Amino acid sequence: MRTGRYIGIMSGTSLDGIDVVLAAIDEHTVAQQARYCHPIPMPIKQQILAMCQGQAVTLSRFGQLDTRLGILFAEAVLCLLQQTGVAPHEVTAIACHGQTVWHEPEGVAPCTLQIGDNNCIAAMTGITTVGDFRRRDMALGGQGAPLMPAFHHALLAHPQERRMVLNIGGIANLSLLLPGQPIRGYDTGPGNMLLDAWTWRHRKAPYDKDGRWARSGQVHQSLLQHLLADDYFLRAAPKSTGREYFNLGWLERKLSRLGPVPAQDVQATLVELTARTIAQQVLLCGGCEHLLVCGGGVRNPLVMNRLSALLPGIEVSPTDKFGVSGDDMEALAFAWLAFRTLSGLPGNLPSVTGAREETLLGAIYPVMPATEKT
């Protein structure tokens, strides 16, 4: 087993920053030791958003963005090392998920694309880097997502209790940790993505702090029904989605079927959409005793309150109460996946992704021992 210290990097679909964590990992434990959040410059964020929504881009601009993100990820790691006093040679590997700019798991040639050049990360830090975690699963017929349920099971499953883990990032995804049943998980639909995009358009703020703007509006029932009628919510698992599907263009097409709707009412309706689509899936799967929530959405009290109201009898709690940082869950998960890859262990779950078999995940970008920086 390649036990040791690992660094995980995650920027996520919300684009609210680059989360970097340092953790000591072995076969049985993941012990977080430090965290750091690195800002994403607005020009880079805007380029990513444009690409995710299908805007044309030259190969030159695409390549430059790939390099710039790789450099930015490396700088985030170097800041964490400086903050902690940990030397590069003390770190076994870096795990970098990369920034998803396209995810298309269906069709004749399924594909997923994460950018942020791992060569830049390995070269600038002198640390072996593991990246490109999703495409091997997809090559075996899987969705390439979600990859979190295996990690959720390793850290948060209980032998008797029915538990589900909900990650509310840009997209919301659910992991079913039900005793005696195969581990399952899938994307329920939009999490913070539409809420943040709508807030930026109308308030020029990165997110709706504490759901205050949404509280000033009312749920528009006709709009809500139009949104809930989308085919994605009716599809059976395994399924996964992203910004290339749930974006402002999607919302505007739904709005075009109605008369004018006040912006604050749209925001209130989007909160209800997120909560309702999550709650429906929890109940469809037979419910649970504990719904453990992580990701940025856990800090939106309006979303959390709606989940509690829609799921009576289920304890809705942050994963922090169970010993795992909700803010750092995804970065920790990819650090753990890198540990599994370097240890020769599979990282995917066919019961979750639909892949034909278990497999190692990720590509390894090694460094020469002589280049390790002290």
Swiss-Prot record:
Metabolic or biological pathway, per its Swiss-Prot or TrEMBL entry: Amino-sugar metabolism; 1,6-anhydro-N-acetylmuramate degradation; Cell wall biogenesis; peptidoglycan recycling
Gene3D superfamilies tied to this protein: 3.30.420.40
One Pfam family it belongs to: AnmK
Keyword Transmembrane helix listed: no
Keyword Transferase: yes
Keywords of this entry: ATP-binding, Carbohydrate metabolism, Kinase, Nucleotide-binding, Transferase
The organism's place on the tree of life at top rank: Bacteria
Stated name of the protein: Anhydro-N-acetylmuramic acid kinase
